[in-house]
Swiss-Prot record:
Post-translational modification: Contains two covalently linked bilin chromophores.
Keyword hit for Transport: yes
Name this protein carries in UniProt: R-phycocyanin-1 beta chain
Family membership: Belongs to the phycobiliprotein family.
Quaternary structure note: Heterodimer of an alpha and a beta chain. Dimers further assemble into trimers and the trimers into hexamers. The basic functional unit of phycobiliproteins is a ring-shaped hexamer formed from two back-to-back trimers contacting via the alpha chain subunits. The trimers are composed of alpha/beta subunit heterodimers arranged around a three-fold axis of symmetry. The phycoerythrins also contain a gamma subunit which is located in the center of the hexamer.
Residue(s) carrying N4-methylasparagine: 72
Binding residues for (2R,3E)-phycocyanobilin: 82
Main location: plastid
Gene: rpcB
Localization of this protein: Plastid, Chloroplast thylakoid membrane
Physiological role: Light-harvesting photosynthetic bile pigment-protein from the phycobiliprotein complex (phycobilisome, PBS). Phycocyanin is the major phycobiliprotein in the PBS rod.
Positions that bind (2R,3E)-phycoerythrobilin: 153
Keyword Membrane: yes
Length: 172
């Protein structure tokens, strides 16, 4: 896993070049956004349990066949596995948001996930809906500035949404 800083340095080093002004400007912007990034990650992680639980409830309300006999989330064991997987995706999205880079999400969570779900007979489209619901909840939290002098963080909220979109696309 590389954060945005390590990635830029590694790329420049591989080319045997100094960092360009554009690269330095991008890293400076990331430093300036650091507190906002931390605030967003804190909001998501502090509410992770509610995000996962409420997203799962909404998914099962829309797709009740998942929790009926024969459904992929039927039995407490399968339900627990579903909630665990949702929590893992949310956790790695928060890591990517903190790092400002999707490589940790891709490498440690998403690579091979579609194949795993296919092998288990889990409908990827349902997983994508669950991820979308977690995205909606997380974006709402990130946009809620009540009690937090977070300022304009629309680009960071878009970045957060992008990590969820990346995860949703990877499972279908």
């Amino acid at each position: 896993m590389l954060d945005a800083f390590a990635k830029v340095v590694a790329q420049a080093d591989a080319r045997g070049e100094f960092l360009s002004n554009t690269q330095i400007d991008a890293l400076s912007k990331m430093v300036k956004e650091g507190n906002q990034r931390l605030d967003i990650v804190n909001k998501v992680t502090s509410n992770a349990s509610a995000i996962v639980t409420n997203s799962a409830r909404a998914l099962f309300a829309e797709q009740p066949q998942l929790i009926q006999p024969g459904g992929n989330a039927y039995t407490s064991r399968n339900m627990a596995a579903c909630l665990r997987d949702m929590e893992i995706v949310l956790r790695y999205v928060s890591y990517a948001m903190l790092a400002g880079d999707s490589s940790v999400l891709d490498d440690r969570c998403l690579n091979g996930l579609r194949e795993t779900y296919q092998a288990l007979g889990t409908p990827g489209s349902s997983v994508a809906v669950a991820i979308q619901k977690m995205k909606d909840a997380s974006v709402a939290l990130a946009n809620d500035t009540t009690g937090t002098p977070i300022g304009d963080c629309s680009s960071l909220v878009a970045e957060l949404a992008g990590y969820f979109d990346r995860a949703a696309v990877s499972v279908v």
